[in-house]
Amino acid sequence: EAVDLARRSDVVLFFFGLNEKSETEGLDRKHLRIPQNQINLIQELAKANANMIGIISAGSVIEMPWHHHFKALLHTALMGQAGAGAVLDILSGKVNPSGKLAETYIKKYEDTPSYNYYPSQERNSEYREGIYVGYRYFDTAGVPVNYPFGYGLSYTTFEYDNLQVKPD
């Protein structure tokens, strides 16, 4: 039904992400993927309509090997009851989506420095990467990512010209 509707539409708005079992306090996720049924639907919708916008509901990083299917992605974190209205305000241009990512969106979990020793059998979290936690690791090691820490767009463009610098 969704694929048929996508074929007949100008644009597809696809809301997806992690469910309440994946987004809970007090436990670690075993992987960084969204549910497989959502991945399958992304692939089928993309065949039906290439003009797709993805609206992600997730409180943490997810792998996105399918992100190329979307013309735009809007990460909404955990929206709450007013989330749909906020998304509508952004997509309609009423407000500027000026937020920036607070985490690095990696290509795959295996690219993280903790991959080889997680999960740990210890009771404490291990940060063997020292000061190179998060974006510092990816920047320093030159590991390609999907979207870096601080990434984000807004509805505007900037252009500089006729710049002048006065020497001191």
For the regions a language model picked out, list residue spans one by one:
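Secreted, periplasmic, or luminal enzymes acting at the cell surface/secretory milieu
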Residues: 57-168
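Hydrophobic helix-and-loop "lid/oligomerization" segment in the mid-to-C-terminal part
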Residues: 1-69
